[in-house]
């Protein structure tokens, strides 16, 4: 039996009691345990890279937004030189919030408690009555700044971490080949379409978190209304009518990132009765452009991506998935009837707010160089589908809290979650990208890979 002694709770329960790697089962208790949650804050959220927003939210010097790295509130700001900083929103004097506004523009942030002031890069300016030196003489002013996280911009997305050692390249791993196709494909990249949508759900962050590990199977049942409306190409009479759309190549990497790559030809059949057979890469891209890409932007794909990446976008593009630990990726095809570009580009983050509470944050994007009518169309599509009251998220927002309620019961905690429908690794012929690959019908492989990434971090003391 596989065993790791890296974590033992106060009642003697070990990590291996909670996550059975031999049976591919996870105890329902993990969704409702305060002690485990506190360890997650230290071992998962303080050790990995977290998505906070996009640089288009703070275009000018002094612009800032407030975000959360798990339960730590941070200021995301741009200084006079244009550099972006992420600072803990805790005054080192008495622990008060330095910034209390959700967003704004300020070249200095002043704590309302005792007036300590800090620059946009987090460095300490001083306290009122400078001659009295109210910061004392035990520490230099250079030591009095706000605690700073490391920052990395990826396709304009703002990531931050408290971990001094983990590089962003190591965090992405082999997933970069695929994620570049979504975030780094045009000259000027993506931009956010307004501030993110946010709402709080009464559930543990891991419930939506593990679903973001490319759980495609739940779509057939939970999101049946999409079929009833003819949106997914199936019919209400039989969920199996949509099964062909569930076939593709799922993939995972050891870091816990997962993606579902679906045949563009199969997707195209849902919208038009035209064959992809014999079409070149460029012809396929013109028939079914990636979500948000206009025909005028297609040449930029060849400029910014490798030949292999462009071929994948044309043939079997990544569409949905997740970045560990708490990001959902949704790049949804929705071609317009006039042949124009459209779709929906959304990223969700599931921010922990306690063992039984999560903040759902929905970031909506479009290509910066897309026409305004395309941006409006994509904003509407994203709100309608993956928005806080969208057709998809209404279903999820009802299901996740019910799992949470079940996790509180004495007997319910003895139930284990099953991840035993496994395909196993198999590399399709001619596949170029890295990672562990699972071709065929979507199964449990990628979600189990998510749990293994979680297990490995939690096992490290």
Model regions and ranges:
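Rieske [2Fe-2S] iron-sulfur-binding domain
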Residues: 57-177
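Short N-terminal helix-initiation segments at or just after the protein's N-terminus
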Residues: 10-20, 96-103, 285-297
């Amino acid at each position: 039996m596989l065993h790791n002694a890296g974590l033992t709770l106060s009642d003697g329960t070990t990590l291996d009691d909670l996550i059975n790697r031999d049976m591919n089962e996870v105890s329902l208790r993990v969704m409702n345990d305060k002690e485990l949650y506190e360890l997650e804050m230290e071992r998962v959220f303080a050790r990995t890279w977290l998505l906070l927003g996009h640089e288009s939210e703070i275009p000018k010097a002094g612009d800032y937004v407030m975000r959360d790295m798990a339960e730590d509130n941070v200021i995301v700001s741009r200084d006079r030189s244009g550099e972006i900083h992420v600072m803990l929103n805790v005054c080192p004097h008495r622990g008060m919030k330095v910034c209390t506004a959700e967003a704004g523009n300020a070249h200095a942030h002043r704590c309302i408690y005792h007036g300590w002031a800090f620059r946009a890069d987090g460095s300490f300016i001083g306290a009122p009555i400078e001659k009295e030196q109210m910061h004392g003489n035990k520490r230099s002013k250079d030591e009095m700044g706000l605690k700073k996280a490391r920052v990395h911009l990826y396709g304009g997305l703002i990531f931050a971490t408290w971990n001094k050692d983990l590089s962003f390249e190591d965090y992405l791993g082999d997933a970069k080949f695929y994620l570049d196709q979504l975030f780094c494909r045009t000259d000027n990249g993506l931009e956010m379409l307004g501030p993110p949508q946010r709402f709080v759900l009464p559930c543990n962050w891991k419930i939506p978190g593990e679903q973001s590990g490319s759980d495609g199977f739940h779509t057939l049942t939970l999101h049946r209304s999409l079929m009833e409306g003819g949106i997914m190409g199936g019919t209400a009479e039989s969920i199996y009518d949509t099964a062909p759309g569930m076939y593709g190549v799922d993939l995972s990497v050891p870091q816990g990132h997962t993606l579902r790559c679906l045949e563009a030809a199969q997707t195209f059949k849902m919208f038009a009765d035209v064959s992809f057979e014999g079409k070149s890469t460029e012809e396929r891209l013109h028939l079914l452009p990636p979500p948000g890409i206009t025909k005028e932007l297609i040449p930029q794909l060849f400029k910014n991506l490798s030949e292999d990446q462009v071929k994948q976008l044309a043939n079997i593009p990544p569409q949905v998935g997740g970045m560990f630990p708490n990001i959902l990726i949704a790049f949804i095809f929705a071609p317009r009837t006039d042949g124009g570009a459209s779709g929906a580009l959304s990223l969700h983050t599931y921010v922990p707010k306690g063992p039984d509470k999560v903040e759902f944050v929905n970031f909506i994007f479009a290509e910066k160089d897309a026409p305004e009518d395309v941006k409006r169309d994509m904003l509407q599509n994203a709100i309608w589908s993956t928005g806080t009251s969208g057709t998809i998220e209404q279903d999820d927002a009802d299901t996740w809290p019910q799992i949470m309620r079940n996790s509180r019961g004495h007997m319910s905690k003895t139930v284990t979650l099953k991840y035993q429908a496994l395909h196993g690794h198999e590399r399709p012929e001619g596949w170029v990208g890295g990672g562990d690959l699972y071709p065929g019908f979507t199964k449990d492989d990628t979600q189990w890979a998510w749990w293994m990434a979680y297990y490995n971090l939690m096992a490290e003391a």
